[in-house]
């Protein structure tokens, strides 16, 4: 059985340490046949030399060996083991080095272990815990609940769909269902492959029951009013108020908000926190420059429960040499503190409470983000296995992987472990949907809508069936009859389905000509037409030269020969200062002369057959 390169190199280093030297032939015998790059071989020889092992053309004499043996005896076994491990790790990285992005991606992906069903549930629970932590924190921000209730009012008025507000509801008492349907779903997943291009709204997430949603929102609204009443009549830190706030959080975290609504609530909280930080930075800048207050002390001031306490602490820490200078910026600091108090009035929370809520939101988001990252990285192999089936359809393999990864991330966001099926079963649909959608949108030079792509695929499938049945390509009439689509639409689809081709496409075996060389340029006159026109002009000029000057000019003006346009009898008459009747007579006489066989024969050959 052939050993791997690392094992062979380890034996080589051990052998070299024992005898004190290595010959080039011994190195060549021990190295794998896969190592053929001269740079890799040079690196290996250099590292062996650095370990104190001589690399020579032939075995050295006995004196040199004795000297090397004395030097080698000074080295401990630990030193040898450490040096061997170092060279092995270095060579291992050299052997695995590649510039191919697909191989680099595969190698990085291979370091992540696959998940078991229990591992998936564990990560899904961590994601859910992180989201619950965010929602429980947001529930303490009154504006968030108000916004959600306002959005539900829009749903009841028909201005917003319920599916645009929530995905559904989480039952905290429900456990993951272990069913036997998973294998059945996996078995039949290929049968539903033709449904990959359906809209995202038609995924396997069940539609939210409007009656259940109404009950949940009524419960949320009632608890919100109870909590507000407790805050107004009692202190927010009162035991009864804290119980009501906790009840509100428990109800609110059961709502599975769509990402857009969830982000809106968090962003509003972030904006409020940003306002506070801006004002605190302004206070810190003034106090440090004009009051000589240490920055560390200021940070302690900003952690106080009430805004008015910040001002008193600042005043207490101003030392005598700085009092006069600080008095000049008193109004500015008091103005900033008023802005902070305005934020407290808008939110109904103290600055300390807003910071606390924001901190818990950040921790919850970080927890959910880490868990989602683990779930995505553990299922990257699934994306590659699906993307392989869609190669040669107009997109690079790496592009297919990236689009599939986007679908995988959507699946992680929407996965519900309580349903009982494995994550891979659910994610497969989203990955396929993302890949097929990207192929429809990006694979063609001229984008075709998704619904038309489906029609084209159906037409191609039926066309192949008819070809197998009758042995020839079907006509548009036959396709129309089989697909129950009007014939004119069939012709339109066939026209759209044609792929564009580059004019630089090589033609012939030598590739010395391109397709564009054989296409007619309709903007340029054909050589035959150009030669015919030149001959006609010459013949006409020759024929007219046999007439009188007056007759030739009348014919030129009447028929627009060598002129921009023709002229009427009156216009020609004015030119010659005669009547239109006289011009008509001159024209008739000149035409009779041209009809003479000696002249007409010259022009007759130009008449169209």
Curated annotation (Swiss-Prot):
Region (Sigma-70 factor domain-2): 375-445
Sigma-70 factor domain-4: region residues: 543-596
Pfam families, sorted: Sigma70_ner, Sigma70_r1_1, Sigma70_r1_2, Sigma70_r2, Sigma70_r3, Sigma70_r4
An individual GO BP term: DNA-templated transcription initiation
DNA-binding region listed in the record: 569-588
Annotated localization: Cytoplasm
Family listed: Belongs to the sigma-70 factor family. RpoD/SigA subfamily.
Function (record text): Sigma factors are initiation factors that promote the attachment of RNA polymerase to specific initiation sites and are then released. This sigma factor is the primary sigma factor during exponential growth.
NCBIfam families referenced in this protein's UniProt entry, alphabetically: PRK05658.1, RpoD_Cterm, sigma70-ECF
Protein name: RNA polymerase sigma factor RpoD
Organism: Buchnera aphidicola subsp. Baizongia pistaciae (strain Bp)
